[in-house]
Amino acid sequence: MDIPDFSSISSRPTIFEFEGISMINHFTENWEKVKNFQARPDDILIATYPKAGTTWVSYILDLLYFGENAPEEHTSQPIYMRVPFLESCFKVIASGTELADNMTTSPRLIKTHLPVQLIPKSFWEQNSRVVYVARNAKDNVVSYFHFDRMNIVEPDPGDWNTFLHRFMDGKSVFGPWYDHVNGYWEKKQTYSNLLYLFYEDLVEDTGREVDRLCSFLGLSTSVSDREKITKDVQFDAMKQNKMTNYSTLPVMDFKISPFMRKGKVGDWKNHFTVAQNEQFDEVYKEKMKNATVKFRTEI
């Protein structure tokens, strides 16, 4: 396995407005190819707000489809090569669209953090299946903060309070969390090929959610295979697995924080002060006043 050389990326990117949301250059420089990406009817798009369970669900789907057929891939190819990140564009590695276009497997598993309004229209036109994963805002912002601390291709997060307020204001990369989770929830009402999963449900009963995925995708995976996959995708197993824990990517400083940190529900209680929690709840109530999607901040 060739490890990409990211040494040429020496400074963190700056945030700017793009298509109505906050973005960084690594996700906009290939925009024409992203926008005009040609989806296929059997593609499966894994969509999430950053740090909401993308890698977890990517790995579940990868094992469901290819665990038996290509076991060697799971020990030699990291997940970010097996499930291309559609909008990613780093000069030192093939872009997400290029990786996806060159995939020989079927179905293609492709991940994105784009809000629903920026998804390439061919996915909808081809009636591709979309698996969306949503995570409660409080745990999501904590995970996003630690991720940005350890990842040099992300903007400088500043201190916790600064990062929290940027998130509350909807100025994090990939835009407001509120719009992201609501946008896909509303799309689900009119687009039947979209499955909406909750991170909290995955933590609570991974096997049940694997069953839901199989049902949605029309897979007849045996009970024993489902049980094995459920075991293989538990947090501690994935955290130790070099093909899923991103330890092969040199842009991440694991001395600051691991890519897979805790994988729990309710860790926000270790970060929010009482004042921050009250302020967050006030903003949340206003931003989500018309939303019908509901979240659990503890299980």
From Swiss-Prot:
Disulphide connectivity of cysteines: none
Molecular function terms from GO: aryl sulfotransferase activity; sulfotransferase activity
Gene3D superfamilies the record matches: P-loop containing nucleotide triphosphate hydrolases
Chief location: cytoplasm
Tissues in which the protein is found: Expressed in liver.
pH sensitivity of activity: Optimum pH is 6.0-9.0.
EC number: 2.8.2.-
Binding site for 3'-phosphoadenylyl sulfate: 51-56, 135, 143, 199, 233-238, 261-263
GO biological process terms held by the UniProt record: catecholamine metabolic process; sulfation; xenobiotic metabolic process
Active-site residues, Swiss-Prot/TrEMBL: 113 (proton acceptor)
Function summary: Sulfotransferase that utilizes 3'-phospho-5'-adenylyl sulfate (PAPS) as sulfonate donor to catalyze the sulfate conjugation of a variety of xenobiotic and endogenous compounds, including 2-naphthol, hydroxychlorobiphenyls, dopamine and T3 (triiodo-L-thyronine).
Temperature-related activity annotation: Thermostable from 20 to 43 degrees Celsius.
UniProt keywords, alphabetically: Catecholamine metabolism, Cytoplasm, Transferase
Cellular component annotations (GO), alphabetically ordered: cytoplasm
Sequence similarity: Belongs to the sulfotransferase 1 family.
Regulation: Inhibited by Co(2+), Zn(2+), Cd(2+) and Pb(2+) ions. Inactivated by Hg(2+) and Cu(2+) ions.
Source taxonomy: Eukaryota, Metazoa, Chordata, Craniata, Vertebrata
Highest taxon above the source species: Eukaryota
InterPro entries: P-loop_NTPase, Sulfotransferase_dom
Compartments in which it is found: Cytoplasm
The protein's name in its UniProt record: Cytosolic sulfotransferase 1
